[in-house]
């Protein structure tokens, strides 16, 4: 068996095109364009690259973008003040705090300074609760991107056994909740899990989201399973040993070109959602 690649690039392009059409309609109706404010603290090269890509995608679809670059030694209090100011700015529809932030920053406090109505990255407690209880809100972008990929490839979820490797607040935990809402049977695995291989071997769907290169070995994958690799590590490799996993899985996301492009497209789509709610 050779797995079919889940093409995040093509799907993201389709979502960006539909988002651009929505931006045009919003501009026609409201006389302004949706606006995304991006806040970046420090000089991390990867973070600067990610922000540049997001700003470029905003330009492509017609979303106004504001970029705020803060010094590496910015304090939590200073960052919170910036985020609160943006939250109260009626011209801003969405706010993205690029993470990870420098170690002196209390990231939780920073996230909670974002108005939930502008939390288009889905990082506040309010957004997390909305995902858990099925309320209207903004899903964390990478989990939402994964769900779109699964739906695009008609992956059945109800009654299926899903194993999520990773328990971060913005990826592992929320993707598990979204899968649970679709009636999957979800198991979380993490650094303290014993016999990870046995858990993975029972999964119909594996979501790897732990940030450890090739942690999930290809021979662990159940024949015919679906594998979503949300990891992105040095050397352009994911959390899954892709070469061997592809010989057992039915569907697998490539790294790069799978989850990443869809995540950015979801961010922009949710920015337009926020603008439409703000009016």
Swiss-Prot record:
Pathway: One-carbon metabolism; tetrahydrofolate interconversion
Positions with a binding annotation for NADP(+): 166-168, 191
Reaction(s) catalysed by this chain's protein: (6R)-5,10-methylene-5,6,7,8-tetrahydrofolate + NADP(+) = (6R)-5,10-methenyltetrahydrofolate + NADPH; (6R)-5,10-methenyltetrahydrofolate + H2O = (6R)-10-formyltetrahydrofolate + H(+)
E.C. numbers: 1.5.1.5, 3.5.4.9
Keywords, comma-separated and alphabetical: Amino-acid biosynthesis, Histidine biosynthesis, Hydrolase, Methionine biosynthesis, Multifunctional enzyme, NADP, One-carbon metabolism, Oxidoreductase, Purine biosynthesis
GO cellular component terms attached to this protein's record: cytosol
GO terms (BP aspect): L-histidine biosynthetic process; methionine biosynthetic process; purine nucleotide biosynthetic process; tetrahydrofolate interconversion
UniProt feature coiled coil, ranges: none
Pfam families: THF_DHG_CYH, THF_DHG_CYH_C
Subunit structure: Homodimer.
Task of the protein: Catalyzes the oxidation of 5,10-methylenetetrahydrofolate to 5,10-methenyltetrahydrofolate and then the hydrolysis of 5,10-methenyltetrahydrofolate to 10-formyltetrahydrofolate.
HAMAP family, A to Z: THF_DHG_CYH
The family this protein is said to belong to: Belongs to the tetrahydrofolate dehydrogenase/cyclohydrolase family.
UniProt name for this protein: Bifunctional protein FolD 1
Source organism of this protein record: Salinispora arenicola (strain CNS-205)
Lineage of producing organism: Bacteria, Bacillati, Actinomycetota, Actinomycetes, Micromonosporales
């Amino acid at each position: 068996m050779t797995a079919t690649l889940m093409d995040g690039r093509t799907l993201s392009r389709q979502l960006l095109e539909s988002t651009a059409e929505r931006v045009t309609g919003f501009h026609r109706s409201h006389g302004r364009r949706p606006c995304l404010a991006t806040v970046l603290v420090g000089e991390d090269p990867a973070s600067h690259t990610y922000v540049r890509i997001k700003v470029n995608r905003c330009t492509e679809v017609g979303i106004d973008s504001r970029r705020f670059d803060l010094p590496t030694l910015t304090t939590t209090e200073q960052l919170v003040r910036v985020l609160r100011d943006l939250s109260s700015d009626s011209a801003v529809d969405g706010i993205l705090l690029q993470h990870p932030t420098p170690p002196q920053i209390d990231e939780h406090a920073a996230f909670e300074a974002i108005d939930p109505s502008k939390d288009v990255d889905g990082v506040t407690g309010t957004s997390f609760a909305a995902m858990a209880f099925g309320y209207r809100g903004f899903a964390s972008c990478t989990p939402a991107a994964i769900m779109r990929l699964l739906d695009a490839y008609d992956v059945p979820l109800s009654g299926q056994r899903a194993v999520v490797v990773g328990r971060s607040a913005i990826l592992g935990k929320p993707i598990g909740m979204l899968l649970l809402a679709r009636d999957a049977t979800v198991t979380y695995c993490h650094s303290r899990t014993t016999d990870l291989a046995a858990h993975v071997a029972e999964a119909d769907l594996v979501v790897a989201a732990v940030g450890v290169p090739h942690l999930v070995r290809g021979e662990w994958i159940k024949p015919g399973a679906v594998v979503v690799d949300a990891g992105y590590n040095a050397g352009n490799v994911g959390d899954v040993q892709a070469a061997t996993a592809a010989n057992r899985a039915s569907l697998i996301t490539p790294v790069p070109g799978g989850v990443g492009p869809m995540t950015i497209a979801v961010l922009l789509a949710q920015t337009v959602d926020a603008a439409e709610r703000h009016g």
